[in-house]
């Protein structure tokens, strides 16, 4: 790699012994060495340095391929920056790096986050483990290929949690919703806690470390649904069962079992963990924040889900308990040499417990532990083991049992889940241990590192392939890129024959082989190998140079750990066990060992498993996740650079970067290149060149050669970016000097002008002072002249006024005398006229009174005659129908109820008034008392003051008299008295002031109490009104529900079937007579002739219904803004009295007609038409129908209407002749407005129809809303991010924007205008169909809420959207929406604009200047009061200024936000920073009824088809 070109002043990274890398500024260059002043102030001389990108975003980049300088310090700094902001995921191409936060971040793993990443291309949203899972799933679905996700990292890096999240997301994508019972995805997910319980343990580095590797193959069918799964495990750490170091723990299952419920403890004969040898080797028994008792129950539940029966679970935990008891068996020396026996009673007890749990003979178990049988050709020899070998035999038995128990659990899970032979594709998730290098490395580390060497080779090949695909896609010329191939290391380990594993197997087959002979064999075989070395100070250790560094292995236990055999005595013991489960484990093992007589070791078998795994991975499309542990103390907020660099190296990330640097590490889009380096050739920006041509011109001008230009990007070799930055820095430095020179010139000119202006001001002031002195002298002289003139005028005027006043007094007296004489004459004449007028008026009034009495007598006689005639007619009608009597009784009952309620209301109001009066009286009395006290206090003060004054006067007179020696005592006493009186006066004055203050405060309290009393009175009135309204509403709903329940219970199936027949009779008023006919209830005809007319009536009624349904099935439009169909249906149902019958089919047929009209309907016009009709018809029903037991019809009572029947009849005679009859017998009942709609006690079919119609209204509303969302969704994707315009020609565009920077370019808001066009279209459609304004405003309110949710969520998930220019773009678009809301008026939009509060405040935060000066309080209370702390933290950390280069909020604010987010995440139920879309119905039936204006139903013209039919003539009746 060529050395980067730098100059003095460049910023570079240099090595640091404490921070790994530290940044500084170049101060001097000496050949290849540079002098760098670090940020700590220290000067470093080095020749190893890397350029630093000073323009890198403050929050880092989400994909490290976007870094201008792709090198180790740049990668490290980017990861550290993002980790500080809780951004734990970062891409490196399509590789995901996950840094363990060591704290819970539940808000980024919730279901709504899964929905956001579903179907989104990789890299479009912020880095996330869900994005990798989705990319694998989409590649499998679209390309039909098998995919794999490889999760790697060292212990504690978060591999297990990452794998669980991946499997959870894949189950979310491929799950089956609504399926009952155990599904495959549930079993796959629940297998994790089972395997964790038996395969995970606490280590020094991790509290939940997986001590085995696993590869989960999830199978999918052709529809992308999970159809099966298989789990493969690798290299379980068997030695942990018997040996653990402090403060580690054994496998979790042992501790879970010790914390089981008491009955299980007793069953398995367990005690506290510290009583068992296999557990008390460490002082750690419990994990922080983990409840073993609840985890035990959770594990049992998970075992149920994965298909392990209760009997099998009991057997599993019996084996686990038996292993604990085996560990407590100790041995002592026997009587014979090299023999052993059970040490004590405690060991014997544990032996018996283990035998009982394993269901085998205790003596046989003892013999198997301490005796061995050797078979020779001559005889069978039985020998006894010494205590050490007996302990080794015990531990071997425990490890063998546990390892095969674990294998059985894995096989059982696979069997239970099942594999689908018809599956089309799979996604494999590999969770395997990362590269390990400790002080002591044994056989386990050797196998683990061998695995990682294999995976690293696969990883390098994949990275190289991705590089080639990138170059090929961009159509640039490329040559072979060299990368370090670790094939030689793999051959060193696995070559057959001659590899380390082969030599180890060879040593295991010879009984006399030791680790020393094995080590010597290695040294002899590989002494010339480049990757193999022998440490100088050890005879048995050996060192291998892996890809991640050198590792020294201790070969002491290699041979023992590589052997895989079972003692024959152990196998015979457990094969004969009475427990089928235990016998099955060892029986299966016996079958496996009997099939092959060839020696099989752990290493060889692991190599075969690894070879099989690599074959599986090679057949899939890989996706990589590298997990990083930021520190070794397992605490959040700590980032250890050396530790992270080591893991990046072990994970192959740095190797991938090196491969990238071998080609073209710097890749910039044309737009970004021109934005950064366009200033190197300003003439290019001023011209109308294509972006690609402009980039070529800049590179040619700077004479660069190591680059390639692709289709969309520029590819730069290593060092070229630094050279461009150096030249750019030079240009910027020259420009800075020019700016400084101009600034200094400006400041000097400004200083000169200020001095000159000061001199001018001083001169002007002096000249002004002289001029003012002269002017003052002239003013004094002029004033003296004016004073003399005015004095002379005053004297002359005073003389004239005196003479004039005397003359006026004389004239006034004479004129007054003449006027009084004239006034007396006029009063006399007026009195005479008044007397005459009163006399004439009295005579006329007497005549009028007599005439009026005669007329009244005549009118009364005539009205009595008419009343008797009408009374006879009413009595005849009452005898025929009996309806009037029922109406009279019901109305009288209603009058009594209303009277009682009125009396109750009056009584409540009277009580309230009395309480008010009493309270006011108390307050007035208290006020009066305080006033009296104040008067008394004032009087006392006055008296005291008078007494003091007298005393002072007396004292003064005394002082004036001559004083003699004998009066000294008297003078002293008087002085004391004066002082006492003065003190008393001051105290009384103070008391008076306090009383005055108390009085004022009492007045204020009195006013406040009066206000509170008035407010309480108003609230009581409002509450009483609200309670009354709610009581009426509840009563109405209870009545409806009661009717519906009773009717549903009483109607038999046969009756229900009859109720749906079209032949059901509907009450109808005949036009010939004012009587009512119903074929089922009234009998106006003779019995023998009843059937034929009734049949004719039913047929006629059926024809009328068919005609009505035929009419409303078509679009019959609107009449003067009123929906004709709704009015037509309502008038017909009222006229036919359909609401009052027990059975009818008309309602069901109307509902079916509406359903057929809107079913699968995509036409907004049709939906809006039926929405308008449904709303109007529901409004009629809401105002008309009420639940009741009878079907009588009542009219709302007007104020002042008489309560008795005859009173109303007599009142009707005094009204107009047209209203003399019953209101429902005239057209006014239908033709009136809403205030005159009569109420009907509806029956079951009518109430059911109302509920069905309400459901259809909500359905139509939802269809319109969802259709609008579907149309707007594609447009919103283009509205969240500002479209990029060609960078060349930008200078010209800037000059135009400078002249008119208010109006945004039309292409920039084209997408927003499309949304406005869509909204206008729907608004016109709804207004054309006269949809109620309430529904229109609710629709747009939810649409704007949807826009708010989509834009806000996209803003929080896409870092490129959280920029200054993007905020301006979205703000411009929101202004378009605000303008539309203003034009559409509040009547139709309502509070829709307020629904955008989240995105408006977020955008306002993006575009505000001087963010670092804003405090958290200002942000949360003034700028963004609606946003939560999680949302503010997300925006603040993702913000970047692509226009002015400013920074986000201060680091102190960020730290405070992070702390609050951490606190909230611990306490809140939901921590998601995303918004949820609300799809509820935001209105009620009452809201619609109250919002709609009066509708004159009678004024609606029926359609021609109805108008021409004589049976519908009642529709043509009009109201006056």
Curated annotation (Swiss-Prot):
GO terms for molecular function: actin binding; ATP binding; calmodulin binding; cytoskeletal motor activity; identical protein binding. Residues 7-56 form the Myosin N-terminal SH3-like domain. Its main location: cytoplasm. GO terms for biological process: actin filament organization; actin filament-based movement; cell division; fruit development; Golgi localization; gynoecium development; leaf pavement cell development; mitochondrion localization. InterPro entries: Dilute_dom, IQ_motif_EF-hand-BS, Kinesin_motor_dom_sf, Myosin_head_motor_dom-like, Myosin_N, MyosinXI_CBD, MYSc_Myo11, P-loop_NTPase. SUPFAM superfamilies: P-loop containing nucleoside triphosphate hydrolases (SSF52540). Residues 732-761, 755-784, 780-809, 803-832, 828-857, 851-880 form the IQ domain. Belongs to the TRAFAC class myosin-kinesin ATPase superfamily. Myosin family. Plant myosin class XI subfamily. This is Myosin-5. The gene is XI-1.
